Every structure is written in C-alpha cells, then in structure tokens.
UniProtKB/Swiss-Prot annotation:
It is found in: Nucleus. Present with 4675 molecules/cell in log phase SD medium. The keyword Ligase does not apply. Component of the Mediator complex, a coactivator involved in the regulated transcription of nearly all RNA polymerase II-dependent genes. Mediator functions as a bridge to convey information from gene-specific regulatory proteins to the basal RNA polymerase II transcription machinery. The Mediator complex, having a compact conformation in its free form, is recruited to promoters by direct interactions with regulatory proteins and serves for the assembly of a functional preinitiation complex with RNA polymerase II and the general transcription factors. This is Mediator of RNA polymerase II transcription subunit 1. Residues 361-425 are annotated as: Disordered. GO terms for biological process: negative regulation of transcription by RNA polymerase II; positive regulation of transcription by RNA polymerase II; positive regulation of transcription elongation by RNA polymerase II; positive regulation of transcription initiation by RNA polymerase II; RNA polymerase II preinitiation complex assembly. Residues 410-421 have a biased composition (Basic residues). Component of the Mediator complex, which is composed of at least 21 subunits that form three structurally distinct submodules. The Mediator head module contains MED6, MED8, MED11, SRB4/MED17, SRB5/MED18, ROX3/MED19, SRB2/MED20 and SRB6/MED22, the middle module contains MED1, MED4, NUT1/MED5, MED7, CSE2/MED9, NUT2/MED10, SRB7/MED21 and SOH1/MED31, and the tail module contains MED2, PGD1/MED3, RGR1/MED14, GAL11/MED15 and SIN4/MED16. The head and the middle modules interact directly with RNA polymerase II, whereas the elongated tail module interacts with gene-specific regulatory proteins. Its main location: nucleus. Keywords: Activator, Nucleus, Phosphoprotein, Transcription, Transcription regulation.
Length: 566
C-alpha cells in the first residue's frame, strides 16, 4: 500500500510538472482533459450548430464553458456555486482597463495556452475541496488524482463548518478595515492581472500602484490535520477574533507571499528579513539563491569590500542575520502580524535598498586604494564562490570590518565602556561643553604621542592651577596603545591647565597633532560616517531614521542622503 501511494504521488508530481511545462493549446478537448486531471466531473452538450458547452463540476463549483465552433474560440465562461453563498468575485481589473472583466474568460481568450486557466482552476478546486458546508452529509470523494485533497475530506467527524468561498470574499473587506483603523496607507484589491488573490498595494514614486504582497489560501503540506479557523476583524475590539470554534477546516493555511521576492530577476530588489525578528513557525518558504546571484544581501556585501562612495564611511551595526522569505503563514491569530510584515517590506524598499543604491559605486570609483581591509571578511562577494558558505548573511563581526570602519570604531569606541554603541549625541554634548572634537576620557586615557628620540614617555604627575569645569584632575600615564589613531591637539587641552613632559620648554606646549596611522586618510570634514543596522540608520550628526518612524520620515532621510552623496 505504501509503495502504491508513493507511486501515485510521484505520478501526480510528474503530471503537475508536465502541465506547467507544456500546458497545451486552448481547445475544448484540452480543457476537458485538464478538468479530468483534477478529478472534476465533465460533460459536453450541443446548444446549437455553432455553440458547444462544456460543464465541469465538483462539490460546490460548477463551471460552464461556451465554445463557438464556427469562430474556433471560447465565447463565454460562467461560475456558479452550489451553496447558500453565490457572490464569489471572479472578476478583476486588468492593467490599462477601466472595467472589471471575467478572470476565467480572460484566461481562455487572452493567453496563448492553458497555463493561466489551469492555475485559476486549481485555486477554485482548492476552495471547493476544503470547504465544508451544512449540505455536506458525507465525505466527498470525486476521484481526484490529488490524494491529499481526498484525504482531507475522509473523516467528517473531525471537520468543522467553513465555506471558504464566502470567507475569502469577506477577508478582503476585513483586511481593508484593519488597515483603516490602524492608519496603514495600503490599498487592498481582490484579484489582479487575471489571478485570484487579495493583493496589498502601495503608491509608487511615479504615482502607480506597486504590489507588495499577495494573500491566498494554500494546502498545508506539512500538517494535513492543521486547523484553519475563521478569524474575522472586529471593529469593536480592533483585533482579529474567532467567533465560533466550530468554524474551521483541516489541512489548509492562509499565506502571504511577498511579491517582490517572487521575482528574482533583480536580486538587489529582494526583501531581506531579520531572522531574529521572525518566528520560524511563520516561515513557509524561503527564496533560494540562483547561481548567478549573491547569497548575501547587497547592503551587507558593502561591509566586506571597499566598493562604496568615497564620501561615506560605513559602520556595521547589524545584530542579526538577514534572510529571504517568500511566504508567511498568517493563518488564525497570525493575521495580527500583517501590518508588521508590511512595515518591514516598506522599510526595506524605501530605506535599505535606496541606501545601498546611493552608497554603491563602480569599482573604478571605489575608495579601496586608500582604505585597505584589516581582515578578509568571512563571506563571499558576488565575484567569488556564491555557494561556499550558508552563513553569508551573518552580521559581520566588528573586528572584521575594513580599515576605514575599524579606525572609526577605535575613535568612537575608545571609552571605558567598550560595549557601548557609538552615539551621535556624544559629539553634541562635547560641543556644548567646549570640547569640539574629542572626549575627555579619550584624551586622558589613551594618548599617543610620537617622540623624536623614540623613548617612551615617563610617568609624571601634572599640577593644575584650578579644577576644570567637569571636576577632573588632569593626569597623563604611560599607556602604550599602538592601535590608536588619536593624538592630542593644543585645543584639546582645557584652558587653565599646565602640563610638563620631562624637560619640555614653553615653546613645546603646543603639541601638533600627528596621524600615526600607516594609511592615508581624507579630511574628516569630507567623509561622513554612516551607521547601518537592520532597523536604524544614522548619517553622522546630520540625520537619522529607524523602522518605527513614519514613512514620511524615511523619505525625507533618503532625499537628504541623496543630496549629500550625489
């Protein structure tokens, strides 16, 4: 029995692959055979000398296809539901058209083969097979070759009542109301471009609608007994609720597919999600990397090489791995997460992708000649082996950054609190206190003074005429730090203090700042520090934005950033 089941499953897979590979031309005979492969009952009747009608039916759906023999084309297609609900929307508005049109008819008249009709017919049959209405008295076995659909209807004692045609039609209204109550600027459309589904769209830069995600029902391949409940949006509680525990169906899930991640032609436009932010139970399908695509996010690749705008100094602040996710399971109470997932999709599209495009430069214009990496990053770039490691999207260790970022990190992170993240507020506070460039702790704890004779500086106590404003007593100790790049300037010493270094004269009081780094550097005024993480971006002391800001704040940040780097 097991061998027989395995044979049938393999045969079904081969049939599905063949139908996708060579769907066949649009004829009445081919449509009849296609319906039979799904287990639909079909028969043909002659309405006149010129018109034939193919009627195909299952438990709920009845589809009539009128074929004009004289003109050799499909003339009309109608869908009727054998249930109390007969208001299922099988119309849509095609691009460039103002009126809604019949999806099933378009599938058979506007395409060269049966592929579009086959996909739409499979969706209708899925809703039919997993719907359980009151008129069902026994399990329905229509002889389908899809064994999973038959097995889902095999035990009626473990089934609830749920009309998926009715629920799917009402779901779009619930989602639209949810967005309205939560002030989410998204548009909801039922069916798009002759495909069934609930589409979430947003306004693009050129004013056109851009699809972000598609919501539809799909067979749960991992758990045939998974219970899908009828969750609706309540305007009173402003949340998704299940009013009846008896309204459910087994073996089906509600899926949200990221439309951008369904198109792998432009790899830089994929949406990358933070792994630690998402529960594994939500992930149905990840995007697999093609052989000619990098397996790490483009914005992460910038940290492993120096191919970026010379006016920008990148600092990596990512704390989690970024992964591609194609489909999310939003069944039942997971419907609450739709807004959060879409928020990240918007953040990735508007901010992360645009930052990458603005910072990226051709290799000939990169700053790699001046800023050599201190350490080779442990993941490959697009010109190396794409499949050498599965950890390519791991956040880059801070010690593995290229030279410019490491040097900046030393300057910014030389305080006693080594785990402290660099903050742009520190520079503002020091300006208010009269210290324009350096932190007092950095000046006192990690000086690096180059002596002509090469001898180390001897430890001396320093006397002061009076206490400084911050209440510190200045002292210089013999601390050797070969990695530091900071040397004191004359304006870095507080007024009212005097320091004696060995037998230095008064003329030596003004200590000239020297760059002890072996690497040439550009003036700091012309290089802006850009701190990038999965949920926030800081552009020096000029501007910043984060995931939780309004979309308008993101757009303003990108506009300002574009003006600076262009």
């Amino acid at each position: 029995m097991v061998e027989g089941d395995s044979y049938v499953e393999t045969l079904d897979s081969m049939i599905e692959l063949f139908k996708d590979y060579k769907p066949g031309s649009i004829t009445l005979e081919n449509i009849t055979r296609l319906c039979q492969t799904l287990g639909l009952e079909s028969f043909t009747e002659e309405l006149s000398n010129e018109l034939s009608r193919l009627s195909t039916a299952s438990k709920i759906i009845v589809i009539d296809v009128d074929y004009n023999k004289k003109q050799d084309r499909i003339q009309d297609v109608k869908l009727v539901l054998a249930s109390n609900f007969d208001n299922f929307d099988y119309f849509n508005q095609r691009d460039g058209e103002h009126e809604k049109s019949n999806i099933l008819l378009n599938s058979l008249t506007k395409y060269p083969d049966l592929k579009a009709f086959h996909n739409n017919l499979k969706f209708l049959y899925l809703l039919d097979a997993y719907s359980h209405i009151e008129s069902d008295s026994t399990s329905h076995n229509n002889g389908s070759s899809d064994k999973s659909l038959d097995s889902s209807n095999a035990s009626f004692n473990n089934q609830g009542k749920l009309d998926l045609f009715k629920y799917f039609t009402e779901l779009s209204h619930y989602i639209r109301q949810c967005f309205q109550d939560n002030c989410c600027d998204f548009k909801v459309r039922t069916n798009l471009n002759d495909k069934f589904g609930i589409y979430i769209l947003t306004q693009g830069i050129n004013g056109k609608e851009v699809p972000l995600a598609k919501i539809y029902l799909e067979e749960n391949k991992s758990d045939s007994q998974y219970r899908f409940y009828e969750y609706i949006y309540s305007q009173e509680t402003k949340s998704w609720i299940n009013e009846s525990a008896e309204n459910f169906s087994n073996g089906i899930s509600l899926v949200m597919e990221i439309v951008a991640n369904a198109k792998e032609s432009n790899y830089t436009d994929l949406i990358w999600f933070p792994e630690d932010f998402i529960s594994p139970e939500l992930i149905i399908d990840k995007v697999t990397c093609s052989s000619n695509s990098s397996s790490s996010p483009p914005i992460i690749d910038l940290f492993s090489n120096n191919n970026y705008n010379s006016r920008i100094q990148l600092m990596n602040d990512f704390t989690t791995k970024l992964i591609n996710i194609k489909k999310f399971d939003i069944s039942n109470d997971n419907l609450d997460l739709i807004s959060e997932i879409l928020k990240w999709v918007q953040w990735s599209r508007i901010v992360l992708q645009n930052v990458f495009k603005l910072v990226s430069t051709p290799s000939s214009n990169s700053n790699s000649s001046e800023l050599e990496p201190d350490y080779q990053a442990p993941f490959s770039t697009s010109t190396k082996d794409k499949n050498s490691s599965t950890s390519n999207t791991e956040p880059i260790p801070r010690s593995n950054r290229h030279g410019s970022v490491v040097e900046a990190s030393r300057r910014r992170r030389s305080s006693t609190n080594k785990s402290k993240r660099p903050s742009i507020t520190e520079a503002m506070m020091l300006k208010e206190e009269g210290l324009q460039q350096f932190n007092l702790h950095e000046i006192l704890s990690e000086p690096a003074i180059e002596e002509e004779n090469g001898d180390s500086i001897k430890e001396h106590s320093t006397t002061m005429d009076g206490a400084n404003d911050l209440g510190f007593t200045a002292s210089v100790s013999n601390q050797e730090n070969a990695g530091t790049d900071i040397v004191m300037e004359d304006h870095g010493v507080l007024q009212g203090t005097s320091q004696n270094y060995g037998t230095a004269t008064a003329d030596d009081a003004d200590i000239e700042m020297k760059d002890v780094s072996s690497k040439p550097s550009k003036p700091e005024s012309s290089v802006l520090q850009l701190i990038v993480s999965e949920d926030h971006i800081i552009l020096d002391t000029i501007s910043e934005c984060n995931l939780y800001d309004d979309v308008k704040c993101w757009s303003k940040f990108i506009e300002k950033f574009q003006d600076i780097v262009s």
